[in-house]
Amino acid sequence: MLVHAYSAMDRSEVLNGAASGGRLSQLSSLNQGPYSSAPPLCHTPASDFQPPYFPPPYPQPPLSYSQSQESGYPHLGDPYSSINSIHHQHQQPSWHTPRSRPEEAGLLSQTHRGLSLDPRRDYGGMSRLIPGLTDGGHSLADSSLSIHALSHHSLEDMQLLDESGISILDQSVIKKVPISSKNNSSMMSALSMNKESLIGGVSNPNEVFCSVPGRLSLLSSTSKYKVTVGEVQRRLSPPECLNASLLGGVLRRAKSKNGGRCLRERLEKIGLNLPAGRRKAANVTLLTSLVEGEAVHLARDFGYVCETEFPAKAAAEYLCRQHSDPTELHARKNMLLATKQICKEFADLLAQDRSPLGNSRPSLILEPGVQSCLTHFSLITHGFGGPAICAALTAFQNYLLESLKGMDKIFMSSTGNGHSAAESKSEKDIKHRK
């Protein structure tokens, strides 16, 4: 009898509460204990009993904080506040934003609808990753994106629009860093000079990156060449744009499982970024495997051999004998003089080449248009091309000089033979008269 009386009282209270129009205020007891003891469910069935309706726990779309309360019931609280708090605590441990902050609530709804950003993310912590923003005083922590920072989200997940005044530089070698619109012009002008090779903050170009043994030297006289940071930067820049595999071959790095990653990490320490999976831009030649020091050494030795050992005199004498016709001697001499002048002009042009090589940064002499073409050729040949052509021109000029000397000898011999023949003829005439 006591059990039936208690259950009847419980049913009457439930029916009275349901008839009074309350919005399930009994659920506030969940804040005290989610697993409180319940009375025994032993009661007599009643035909007029209507149990209260509880909505099923299906997933509902999240509402913004400004819409968390219904407009028709401003005086009532959220009946599922405790349940939602428990659900978010287990499902989304990184969501710790309280509901009692109306300022951030309105900001979150505007940012979520306008920029299609995840409302649980906050990019205010990225200002420390951008040196340009911290220096200029323009940080994302003061902008409309400052909500709550989550450091495990990457910068590439951002979807920024032009209306927010923020843009992202997308190049293969330059890391994607958001910059403010005020600094766009200055940074873009600096990046346009060095395409997809240089990152702001590159260390001293004259600093030695590593020492590389030569490929062309004998085992008895092996020499090492110092590779500077500037040379590594030139190998990563156009026109070659070497990848990690080719650059490792140039630097004589042994192949290993993580060799490319180790090389990229070392390059990042000096401010250079070598992306994985990069494709080379130029064809690979034998000169690609040479560092600039060895290429210049090869060009210098080639120039020495051309100047001292090239058979310029023998070649000139042979060709002069091929063209010994007295009627062509004058015209041929004029052609040799004109060719010598043209060759001298071209050699003087190459002597004014100021392409970057090693740790030297000479001042420019030629016009930028001509110098850029010569620099392109020098970068492709790692500094061997220009000195090698000058050495070949030196050998050709020596041939021209020997040819002119041979022409002068022919002229002298021809004029000498003419004088002797005239003298003998005059002597014969005198004897005949006698």
Swiss-Prot record:
Biased composition (Pro residues): 52-62
Gene Ontology process terms (BP): positive regulation of transcription by RNA polymerase II; regulation of cell population proliferation
Cross-referenced Pfam families: TF_AP-2 (PF03299)
Keyword Secreted listed: no
GO molecular function terms listed in the Swiss-Prot or TrEMBL record: DNA-binding transcription activator activity, RNA polymerase II-specific; RNA polymerase II transcription regulatory region sequence-specific DNA binding
UniProt region (Disordered), positions on chain: 30-123, 415-434
Biased composition (Basic and acidic residues): 422-434
Cellular localisation: Nucleus
Ranges of biased composition (kind: Polar residues): 81-97
Known partners and oligomeric status: Binds DNA as a dimer. Can form homodimers or heterodimers with other AP-2 family members.
Record family assignment: Belongs to the AP-2 family.
Name recorded for this polypeptide: Transcription factor AP-2-epsilon
Species the sequence originates in: Xenopus laevis
Upper lineage: Eukaryota, Metazoa, Chordata, Craniata, Vertebrata
Gene for this chain: tfap2e
